[in-house]
Design a protein with these regions (language model features):
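FMN-binding flavodoxin-like domain, especially the glycine-rich phosphate-binding loop
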Residues: 1-133
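Short gly/pro-enriched beta-turn/loop segments at secondary-structure junctions
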Residues: 132-135, 147
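Iron-sulfur cluster-binding cysteine motifs and their immediate structural context
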Residues: 140, 145-174
């Protein structure tokens, strides 16, 4: 959760943890590294879900796996899930749909059917694809009332609550 900051979470080797990460340009958003620095796997098993806007996951599952392994998790599964694109909702509109949900249920059933969850390798390449961002940032218009809802909802605090007309492009992950 991007909006939860600064508290430690520890798991044990008896735990099975599901991580759902957003994918931007085939990569994890950099704030995920900070958030994960507070998470301690201690041998817990991890299932990774890369959520992307109908473009491509590219190296994201491998990057997620490396991040989780470095935090003490054993990666035992991974899946790609399509959702509406975060900027242009026409891409991935109506997703996940019934076939997507069926595929996810099949994946979950296969995990549950295993006698023992063992580590698996995730697809992707090292070094990861370079992510240069996209030159699109939230902006306000004459319709902006200055209510600050956008600043409250922004997961990376890129929009200044005192001046919601301003977006810090260095923090924005859009």
């Amino acid at each position: 959760d991007y909006t939860t900051r600064g508290y430690e979470v520890s798991f044990s080797s008896d735990d099975l943890v599901f991580f759902c990460f957003p994918v931007y340009g085939g990569r994890l958003p950099t704030p995920m590294y900070d958030r994960m620095s507070y998470v301690h796997g201690n041998g817990a098993k991890a299932v990774l879900v890369a959520v992307y806007g109908n473009r491509a996951v590219e190296d994201a599952l491998l990057e997620m796996s490396d991040l989780c392994l470095n935090r003490g998790f054993k990666v035992v599964g991974g899946a790609e899930m399509i959702a509406p694109h975060s900027i242009d909702k026409r891409f991935g509109a109506g997703r996940p749909d019934a076939p997507d949900i069926a595929a996810l249920n099949k994946f979950l059933s296969s995990l549950m059917a295993k006698q023992e969850l063992t580590p698996v390798a995730m697809p992707g390449k090292r070094p990861y694809k370079e992510y240069k961002g996209i030159p699109v940032y939230p902006t306000s218009s004459s319709k902006c009332s200055g209510c600050g809802t956008c600043a409250q909802e922004c997961p990376t605090e890129a929009i200044d609550p005192g001046d919601p007309q301003h977006t810090d492009k260095s923090k924005c992950i859009s």
